[in-house]
From Swiss-Prot:
One of its GO terms (cellular component) is host cell cytoplasm. Induction: Expressed in the early phase of the viral replicative cycle. One of its GO terms (biological process) is endocytosis involved in viral entry into host cell. It comes from African swine fever virus (strain Badajoz 1971 Vero-adapted). This is Phosphoprotein p30. Modifies the subcellular distribution of heterogeneous nuclear ribonucleoprotein K (HNRNPK) and may contribute to modulate HNRNPK functions related to processing and export of mRNAs during ASFV infection. Necessary for virus internalization. The lineage of its organism: Viruses, Varidnaviria, Bamfordvirae, Nucleocytoviricota, Pokkesviricetes. Phosphorylated on serine residues in the 115 N-terminal amino acids. Belongs to the asfivirus phosphoprotein p30 family. It is found in: Host cytoplasm; Host nucleus; Virion. Oligomer. Interacts with host HNRNPK. Keywords: Early protein, Host cytoplasm, Host nucleus, Host-virus interaction, Phosphoprotein, Viral penetration into host cytoplasm, Virion, Virus endocytosis by host, Virus entry into host cell.
Amino acid sequence: MDFILNISMKMEVIFKTDLRSSSQVVFHAGSLYNWFSVEIINSGRIVTTAIKTLLSTVKYDIVKSAHIYAGQGYTEHQAQEEWNMILHVLFEEETESSASSESIHEKNDNETNECTSSFETLFEQEPSSEEPKDSKLYMLAQKTVQHIEQYGKAPDFNKVIRAHNFIQTIHGTPLKEEEKEVVRLMVIKLLKKNKLLSHLHLMF
């Protein structure tokens, strides 16, 4: 139980340091991977439970003190919506893959990849006209675009990818570089479809 307490203490520091935007929370969630030893990673289900428990505690602070944490005078309703988006990003994979979490951890040692996309390069390349072949990647791209539509600015693409990698590292294989590129191009395509590209100078 000592390592669970250790996780909890570290997570309290991470999640309560700066909660002014969902993208920062997503970034902190992704950075948790670097805090955990291989032994703790191999206890994926316990880690996920510990994260959810602490997030539930933080949720109260976010919703009840939204104007403090958001820094932009968000209403309680807006804070609740943002909170739901955070949970969706962090835990979308859990239900379908937690049953097999014990068999995939030997792949984790050297598979933590950093996304190389940036705000400057995110929209440089034109997307292909092919329909998305991977529904999980498409859902990740959709969440990014939904955040742009709802909050008027794009989340840090690196942070969204890193959070997704964190959950994948516990329950499966992290996104490969080519998969990250697929998501990037899907985001461009969806933004063009929704006629949001003209507002990019306001988002970044």
